A protein has these predicted regions:
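Transmembrane helical cores of multi-pass secondary ion antiporters/exchangers
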Residues: 1-433, 511
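Cytosolic C-terminal regulatory domains/tails of membrane transporters and channels
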Residues: 432-520
Length: 520
């Protein structure tokens, strides 16, 4: 009964946070929920500790469905286009952070062994996907930066967790085999992705099979979709792969609705979107409330320790945060410079073939600004805390390590909440932009009405529904014509046609078939 009451208390807290978020829009909802979690810790005491007795339980219960939904909603083409940069951040940067934090913490605090310091660095490697999404809402971040941050947060959990496990094993046994570690890492990384893709394809096959039998049941499809991440995580984990990566891979290939349109498809999309919106909001809130409830437990012992001053502890936290920021900034800056150099060479080659002026290269200041946004826009969060709380009691300076990790979580969340919007402020929209937003809102409303009408269509109302839907489509067409809105394929074709006309005119001028004045 007490556990049930605690669950109700957390749900009520999430509900309250949604109201407070509207009253205090400048403070991100994760920080509000963490603050409310701190208050719950005083009321609930140690009861919530049961959720963190086993980090795998936390991962499968909360992180798995959230990552599955994030991957399902992610823009696959952007992720694939930026795959090299995402893998660089999710694997290379995590390893760089492990090495930098490990050696620095061991040198700064000799009582923490090198292996334990590496474990701390591994726990601090992953970014929090929920906090990343929250930080992106309050800042004007470029599409590429958003894609990189989201893609990184989907993958780097696995690399950080695997590295953490090896570091803890080395700290406990005093032995470390690089060959064994690399083999295990490849098994978990590649195996997790492979298992996720296979299970995702199997899930799609099951849905298509049920659909082929004529069982167009919305309840079955939505429940099957919600059920999928838990099964994928547990199956991949039992097979030796990374459950986190398996869930992400399954989400990326998840296609629960068919490509053809129809009333049943519209109904399925509406229900699925609504269900996932509620699940995502609730789990996101509970995750950060739980994070708030765990901070006092993780930090109280070290904070009250008379053997080390509180000022020294704060200096340790700020120094480690600075190391993390510096390593991440340098890595991202170099990555962006290399990326834009390749893009510039490709553009120059294409411009030379078409005999047009190439686009100017991105400046160092531009890349430094983007790197600063991406550096502070990747805060640490629940995965870091869930992993660091599993450090065995036998590890020397365990409480100090917990304190340092929790302190860095708070610092990075504060920076993401208050500094990123300053670096990338949302642009003030003029009347033209407001008008465009209003027009787009009208179009969205009309499309939703069409989808709802199709979802509620019955055999008796089919003919009438088609007439009304045709009228709404005509309204959409008129609004587009009045406001000069074109669909993306038409726009691309028009731009391509203009490019051909310009190139043809330039050739006529160069061959003196027409004079320069007439050509231009």
């Amino acid at each position: 009964m007490e556990t049930f009451l605690l669950i109700l208390l957390m749900l009520a807290t999430v509900l309250a946070s949604s109201v407070i978020d509207q009253l205090v829009p400048k403070v991100s909802s994760p920080l509000i929920q963490i603050g409310l979690g701190l208050a719950i810790a005083v009321v609930a005491g140690r009861q919530i500790d049961l959720l963190f007795d086993e980090s795998k339980l936390f991962l499968v219960l909360f992180i798995a469905p959230l990552l599955f939904h994030e991957a399902k909603e992610a823009k696959k083409t952007e992720l694939w286009r930026n795959r090299r940069s995402i893998l660089s951040l999710a694997i290379g940067l995590v390893l760089a952070i492990i090495v930098a934090v490990g050696f620095f913490v061991n040198a700064m605090i000799p009582s923490i062994s090198l292996a334990a310091a590496f474990a701390l660095g591994a726990a601090l490697g992953p970014t929090d996907p929920i906090a990343v999404s929250a930080a992106s809402k309050d800042a004007d971040i470029s599409p590429r930066c958003k894609s990189l941050l989201k893609g990184e947060s989907l993958i780097n959990d696995a690399s950080g967790i695997v590295a953490f496990q090896f570091a803890i094993a080395a700290a406990m046994t005093g032995a470390f085999s690089p060959a064994h570690a690399i083999g295990e890492f490849l098994l978990e990384f590649v195996g997790g992705i492979a298992f996720g893709l296979i299970l995702g394809v199997i899930g799609n096959g099951i849905v298509r099979l049920v659909r082929s039998w004529g069982l167009e049941n919305t309840t079955f499809h939505v429940l099957f979709e919600v059920f999928t991440p838990f099964i994928v995580f547990l199956a991949a984990d039992q097979l030796g792969g990374s459950g986190i990566l398996a869930v992400v891979a399954a989400g990326l290939v998840n296609v629960i609705s068919p490509r053809t349109a129809g009333p049943s498809v519209s109904r399925l999309n509406i229900v699925s979107t609504s269900v996932w919106r509620v699940i995502s909001f609730t789990l996101n809130g509970i995750v950060f409330v739980l994070l708030g409830t765990q901070l006092p437990r993780a930090m109280q012992t070290t904070w009250s320790n008379v053997a080390i001053s509180n000022w020294t502890l704060l200096i340790y936290v700020l120094t480690i945060s600075l190391i993390l920021i510096a390593v991440r900034f340098v890595w991202v800056l170099l990555m962006e410079r290399v990326h834009h150099r390749h893009v510039a060479k490709r553009n120059e080659k294409a411009a030379k073939e078409k005999n047009i002026a190439p686009e100017p290269r991105k400046s160092l200041a531009h890349d430094a600004h983007s790197a600063a946004i991406m550096t502070l826009g990747g805060p640490k969060g629940t995965v870091t805390l869930a992993v660091i709380l599993t450090i065995p009691q036998a590890i020397a300076q365990r409480q100090l390590i917990l304190f340092l990790a929790c302190g860095v979580i708070v610092v990075t969340l504060l920076l993401a909440t208050f500094v990123v919007p300053i670096l990338a402020p949302q642009k003030k929209r003029d009347n033209t932009e407001q008008l465009e937003r209003d027009v787009q809102a009208n179009l969205d409303i009309l499309r939703i009405v069409i989808e709802e009408l199709s979802a509620r269509q019955t055999p008796e109302t089919r003919a009438a529904t088609r007439i009304v839907v045709r009228q709404y489509n005509d309204r959409i067409k008129r609004i587009k014509e009045l406001n000069g809105i074109e669909d993306e394929p038409n726009m691309k074709l028009r731009l391509r046609t203009l490019a051909w006309e310009r190139e043809f005119a330039r050739n006529l001028i160069e061959t003196d078939e027409v004079d320069r004045f007439a050509g231009y």
